[in-house]
């Protein structure tokens, strides 16, 4: 990563040059002069803001729907080539952001004062969190009227679920990889869940024991490794689209529906008489894996004031495209409204592991 340009930092008012108070009249006036704002967005729903933002501020949003990891690779390459066209990143690849992009000053945090009091410290630093999303397990509610057909992650290793668990390929989908990696990071919980499910301590497969002996970085087998081995032996089906997974699980015109690991907010895709899928809330040991989606200013952004204005907008009324069941606003008041409107548990009441 190239070093950030101090003159730009000073002009943009970021980092150590951020003013003590935010003059929004001045920011808005400067943003209108800039006239456009370019955003790399992990969500295609950014397109829903184009007209309303243009109407309110006279500023054009140029949005690109790009996966989080690819956003950062694109930004890095452009930055190193001296090409600076993007203003805002809307990104959920927290590990790369925290370990690479932020330390290299490739992106800059910005917290609109109007929402600061509604956020926890971890939602303001090191980056501004707009919402909390999750990867969870869905089942077909229409064809399982008595409730979820599984109650443990270990059920996915049973023969009856061979070839019947859908998920995005961890080799192609970074959030799917994060889901698996997070399970791997919690072996004690997985061991306890095994004992609850089968009534006896876990015994490791010979293949796992042999594999671990040949990996210098792993001391000994554990329950998470064993789960992953058995899960992969049970032939899960990798599909490229999280929406496709949801629909394949929820399709009511089938006899033997699969279960699927996909995005919690796909709940909005349910359609009466067509799709009926629901979350497995009481899955043992964990309901799912949660990850934040953050907003930030790109280093050397050509339109830093429009970037600030768009970030504030996406935290306030511009949150509406993401005001869907399963996407929890970081803002306390908005989340409270969501819980009531969507009849969902509060975010803090869900059994979720952070990536």
Region locations from a protein language model:
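Extracellular/periplasmic catalytic domains that process cell-envelope and extracellular macromolecules
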Residues: 30-32, 81-84, 128-132, 158-160, ...
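A ligand-binding cleft/hinge motif common to bilobed small-molecule-binding domains
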Residues: 95-100, 250, 257-278
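Extracytoplasmic ligand-binding site segments that recognize negatively charged/polar headgroups
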Residues: 40-51, 62-76, 84-250
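Mature extracytoplasmic/periplasmic domains
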Residues: 289, 293-354
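N-terminal low-complexity, Pro/Thr/Ser-rich intrinsically disordered segments
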Residues: 1-30, 208-212
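Periplasmic-binding protein-like
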Residues: 117-120, 131-135, 227-231, 274-299
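Short, polar/charged alpha-helical segment
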Residues: 2, 21-32, 42-60
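Loop/turn elements at helix/coil->beta-strand transitions in domains of secreted/extracellular proteins
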Residues: 34-37, 58-60, 84-87, 161-165, ...
